[in-house]
């Protein structure tokens, strides 16, 4: 059976960076499930299709190629806004969850990060992590990331956006953001990326040892 690591958490908590490091460490396949919603939204926008037609959005979601998700292209703010509109559609979520589960079966192992991996997509994952940080810390990270990339950023606007996204993610009727009961909580507010990685690695190593 494939070894699955589920990493959930709110926006800008550091789960993407952590997931990529873990996947690299163990030679596992990595999927940022948030990009699957963004890819669906971009496909709709590129085709000039409406973002409020659930049947059309579901059909588009079923045609998304998970092997060709380009983080740089899909990180555009307008795509993120569109993705948040289709992400609340149950039919779209069902279609993408099916694709994400199929990805999770890849050998020798997979790391999936998102909002509902440990609770909905892969409830039987060998390791479940819930990565979080205070809204202030997450907004500062996002702000610094944009500035480092040569962009202009307004901390207050980003902070408000982080809080808005938290409310939307946690208040969603279908698959709300919450830690799985058996998830290990990693608060990265005061943690470096390296410290978070080492904490996660300890948990993964222990689970791998149990599997053997």
Swiss-Prot record:
GO terms for molecular function: ATP binding; CMP kinase activity; dCMP kinase activity. It catalyses: CMP + ATP = CDP + ADP; dCMP + ATP = dCDP + ADP. Keywords: ATP-binding, Cytoplasm, Kinase, Nucleotide-binding, Transferase. It is found in: Cytoplasm. InterPro entries: Cytidylate_kin, Cytidylate_kinase_dom, P-loop_NTPase. Coiled coil: none annotated. GO terms for cellular component: cytoplasm. CDD domains: CMPK. ATP binds at residues 9-17. GO terms for biological process: pyrimidine nucleotide metabolic process. Its EC number is 2.7.4.25. It holds the Pfam family Cytidylate_kin. Gene3D superfamilies: P-loop containing nucleotide triphosphate hydrolases. The keyword Nucleotide-binding applies. Belongs to the cytidylate kinase family. Type 1 subfamily. This is Cytidylate kinase. The gene is cmk.
